[in-house]
Amino acid sequence: MQFSDNGVRFDVTLRGTITFTDDLTDVQSLSDGGSLTMRDWSRVIPRTVEIKSAAGKLTRAYFVGGLSRPWDEEAQRFLATQLPMLVRRSGLGAESRVQTIFEKKGVTGVLEEIDLLGGDYARRLYFVALVDRARFDSNGVKPVLARIGERMTSDYDRRQVLQHIASRVTLDESGAAAYIQAMATMTSDYDQRQALETLMQSGASVDGNAIAGAVDHIKSSYDRRIVLNQAIGRGSLTVESKRSLLAGAAGMKSDYDRGQVLTSYVQRYGVEPPVREPFFAAVKAIKSDYERRRVLTEVAKKDGGNREIQQAAFDTVSQMSSDYDRAEILLAFVSAQGIDSASRPAFVSAAERLKSSYDQNRVLAALVRAERR
């Protein structure tokens, strides 16, 4: 392992399992056959400490410029001076450090130690070890989630810790909200999507509004689609959650991804009266006539006989430009459950707007045949 910080440059090699003294001035134990090598390149002449374990005993060696020096006060002072920075920067011995601190000071003590760490890699190791050691419930893990959101800046390391929590702790709605809040400053669409997927797959009680709020931070239409489709597939969404998710779909940039989300939504829930307005607003946000047709054809299959849905669909069709796609949508509604008498004027108006005589004739002919049945 190599790292540098404020002019300090170190090479560190660890073999085996290591524990340090509580004050981080020395190595307390090292698994048999293990070794720790620290080489400081910060000065013109490098200094090296080698600690080895054999037959239950530790041996220490000190080198300056490659030449062996006695293990004296200078050597011990060098180790004691550099070890705190080394341990807190690299995360060496994280599991044993967390165990020792947790046994003496509890969760608060470990969180205080995490505040002293010098990087997100080390923080990740400590957070993961704490979660494994403490065996939190949903309420108990909230301070940890808050500290993750406050202290971690690396999206990758933060996501790794959050996923570990989701896999170890059964989160209730409040805990899931704290989890999502811990993601608030993440910028990587991939890491946000992965963290949300793991949360939903874990069986946590996730509020749909919270998911929709998190989705608003995701710029990638692909990543947003994956999250929204997973949220839709979970079922048991409140009306308000459905409205929020549909608003999230409307804000997507890709017509393909938006169409995929709306199609999944229709297949799962249909178009219920309380969400009709946000649903069709999302459909109208689709610029591609082909993608609109895909969604509205699915609507026709699911709720094609509903008068209000027919009228909203025909209004949307009238704003499209492709005669073929418009005709196919109108035919899908005719084939589904027929056209409601109250919706017939809107249907005929949409058909008459077709510039293609061929498409107009086949749509109106289908209407006449359906009415004769």
Where are these regions (language model features)?
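Non-catalytic all-alpha helical scaffold/repeat segments
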Residues: M1-R373
